[in-house]
């Protein structure tokens, strides 16, 4: 329908991997993805890693050419449904257990003036969210390392 007209390949991009009308991974972050724009990987493959693998393959392909190229990589992370590899989630469960008691609050850092200063919990109970951010950071690092190796 109309939404498909707005997909990247109809807006000047040569390649669109995994981009659909959904702003989130409809079937979750682990293969099978049930995404018409991305073939399923091995069962249990993590989407953030897969998108990085695809981006690295494109860097390899396009860097053989002399013309510059533009790549836009948008991870679905950290959108719901929250999910990450279990070893990463366990890492942040362990870190969370080492933090002070759950009732400890502190003033939220303000980067601009705000009328209502709020307090936030020191101990956040979001190990899966933290694991997703960690995975995204790791994958951005992989892609940057690939780009650096191509200089």
For the regions a language model picked out, list residue spans one by one:
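Active-site-proximal cap/lid insertion segments
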Residues: 3-8, 15-151
């Amino acid at each position: 329908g109309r939404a498909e007209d707005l997909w990247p390949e109809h807006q000047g991009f040569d390649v669109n991997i995994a981009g659909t009308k959904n702003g989130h991974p409809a079937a979750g972050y682990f293969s099978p993805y049930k995404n018409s724009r991305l073939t399923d990987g091995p069962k249990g493959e993590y989407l953030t890693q897969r998108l990085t693998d695809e981006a690295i393959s494109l860097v390899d392909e396009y860097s053989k050419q002399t013309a510059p190229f533009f790549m836009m990589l948008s991870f679905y992370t950290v959108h719901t449904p929250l999910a990450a590899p279990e070893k990463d989630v366990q890492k942040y469960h362990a870190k969370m257990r080492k933090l002070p008691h759950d009732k400890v609050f502190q003033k939220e850092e303000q980067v601009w003036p705000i009328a209502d200063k709020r307090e936030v919990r020191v101990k956040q109970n979001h190990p899966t969210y933290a694991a997703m951010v960690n995975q995204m950071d790791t994958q951005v690092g992989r892609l940057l390392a690939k780009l650096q190796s191509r200089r």
